[in-house]
Amino acid sequence: MSIAPDGRKLLRLEVRNAETPIERKPPWIKTRAKMGPEYKELKALVRREGLHTVCEEAGCPNIFECWEDREATFLIGGEQCTRRCDFCQIDTGKPADLDRDEPRRVAESVQAMGLRYSTVTGVARDDLPDGGAWLYAETVRQIKALNPNTGVELLIPDFNADPDQLRAVFESRPEVLAHNVETVPRIFKRIRPGFRYERSLAVITAARDYGLVTKSNLILGMGETPEEVRAALHDLHDAGCDIVTITQYLRPSPRHHPVERWVHPDEFVDHERYATEIGFAGVLAGPLVRSSYRAGKLYAQTVAKRSAVSLSNGEIA
């Protein structure tokens, strides 16, 4: 294999990755489809209206639960990312021109689906003067204008930690500002060459300093050790991260990073317990957890925990 699905020549790293066959999944990597009434209604509506969600297009295993809770995730910024992470199925390349009408369409999709909570994520747009900050912020504004009772979680790239670009995004006031570090420092450069670990932590700190609820994600199975996971959890908590999700890496294709280990569910239980003990307000860990999984419930849990802490400290909520 020397050509990627999008027609470009494979990178040397991708050629090396492809030498390792796709791994066989362990028995605990499976889901049961529970198609409740809310899920069935949303499924029919999405098909009828021609709407697009990450949930369907990425084949997320949690779609049945999330749609039953009226939660969904949308991808903005196009189908090409200006950076390449070795675990990510989104293609790298020159993106299409900025679609300034996209925020309106996403907001209308949220309205049509009657969502209680929406997650918006997107590609890195280093080709744009503002890194795509306007697009992310405007999408939040449009959703809130059309859906005042819908929560919005915004999962952003790092915008190179540019203060002006970050401020433009923060001013849109999503319920949760998420930025995923994804892996531990020792293998970070190998897995995410376009990002920097400390820079990602700085983005989370900036969001927390702005007064936003913050969130991040760790993907296990790419070469880290359990001890490194705990150290990364400390780094995230010290940076001001309120919510963390921890998941198993599932390889999208042979050209992506091989799975180094299948993390047993018991280890996820240990990590969730540890993250809670060191002070995270919201934690979810498991083989099939994804960063947007049960996002609305995690946000509500975090707000309730913050309020309880304020009351116990004698503060006025």
Curated annotation (Swiss-Prot):
Amino acids binding [4Fe-4S] cluster 2: C81, C85, C88
GO cellular component terms listed in the entry, alphabetical order: cytoplasm
Cofactor(s) this protein requires: [4Fe-4S] cluster
GO molecular function, one term: 4 iron, 4 sulfur cluster binding
Cofactor binding note from Swiss-Prot or TrEMBL: Binds 2 [4Fe-4S] clusters per subunit. One cluster is coordinated with 3 cysteines and an exchangeable S-adenosyl-L-methionine.
UniProt-annotated location(s): Cytoplasm
Keyword check for ATP-binding: no
InterPro entries: Aldolase_TIM, Elp3/MiaA/NifB-like_rSAM, LIAS_N, Lipoyl_synth, rSAM
NCBIfam families: lipA, PRK05481.1, PRK12928.1
Family: Belongs to the radical SAM superfamily. Lipoyl synthase family.
Name by which UniProt lists this protein: Lipoyl synthase
Protein species of origin: Mycolicibacterium gilvum (strain PYR-GCK)
Lineage, opening ranks: Bacteria, Bacillati, Actinomycetota, Actinomycetes, Mycobacteriales
